[in-house]
Amino acid sequence: AASGLEAAMKAAGKQYFGTALTVRNDQGEIDIINNKNEIGSITPENAMKWEAIQPNRGQFNWGPADQHAAAATSRGYELRCHTLVWHSQLPSWVANGNWNNQTLQAVMRDHINAVMGRYRGKCTHWDVVNEALNEDGTYRDSVFLRVIGEAYIPIAFRMALAADPTTKLYYNDYNLEYGNAKTEGAKRIARLVKSYGLRIDGIGLQAHMTSESTPTQNTPTPSRAKLASVLQGLADLGVDVAYTELDIRMNTPATQQKLQTNADAYARIVGSCMDVKRCVGITVWGISDKYSWVPGTFPGEGSALLWNDNFQKKPSYTSTLNTINRR
């Protein structure tokens, strides 16, 4: 059996096991990311978002994004680039601009061409459109939807395809894992893009999950069979699927029992990817609980990743590795 997550995924016929990354000087984290048996893909956590790269119109800030791209390419890792068109972390000049259909499309095109052009040939995957759905499966309100209508989604894919035909183009969202109205909305988006005669290569399921009911999520992680059926239903549209931002949070503080329940939830998610041929990879949203976004966003919740604050492997690490090795 393979001794690391990336090695195990490769042995299982998958493409990668990855992590989100914010470059920082912490040797404990760096040592894990340097281990090619453990990690094989990097997603910049924030450095490639619109407000980070183009905070003012025509003013591009490439330093952090370049640094994160180099973190992947220097190690020979895949680079899941994230994200081009999203309502959040969008600079106010875009969100509050006085646009019409034509001028907003020009802004989208300029941004997509600049960003995808700079990293062309480095990004193995791109999250082209992120979080375009409400929980009921309708389209989320955004400047893009208000000005252009639902066509902004296929338009973004068309622009992305023109800017870098070599990368895999994804739609990415959260709460798609439950087989509900939002899942159906993601299927509608895939069909919409294809109806324009365009390519959509994959659907990313963020997989920000819980291992027990919490104040922010009533429904803990579903069964492996349920998760696999959801993945297969998406893959049946002719797209790859991936878990792109996996973390499984709990009400803190953690206990041994909670950590084991959490490990079981990880096994269900990871196992569902093993069960679906077109599930190409898994990315966790960070290495260690020390830097997880969860406690800051969901107070009283946490312990959501595979390594603890001291970079020790948790029960969730063991269950993840064992599940991949068992397939």
Swiss-Prot record:
- List the Gene3D superfamilies: Glycosidases (3.20.20.80)
* Molecular-function GO term, any one: endo-1,4-beta-xylanase activity
> What is the catalytic activity of this protein?
Endohydrolysis of (1->4)-beta-D-xylosidic linkages in xylans
Q: What is its main location?
A: secreted
Instruction: Provide details of activity as a function of temperature.
Output: Optimum temperature is 40-50 degrees Celsius.
Q: What's its job?
A: Catalyzes the hydrolysis of the internal glycosidic bonds in heteroxylans, releasing mainly xylobiose and xylotriose. Most active on oat-spelt xylan.
Q: How does it assemble?
A: Monomer.
Q: What is this protein called?
A: Endo-1,4-beta-xylanase A
What species does this protein belong to?
Fusarium oxysporum f. sp. lycopersici (strain 4287 / CBS 123668 / FGSC 9935 / NRRL 34936)
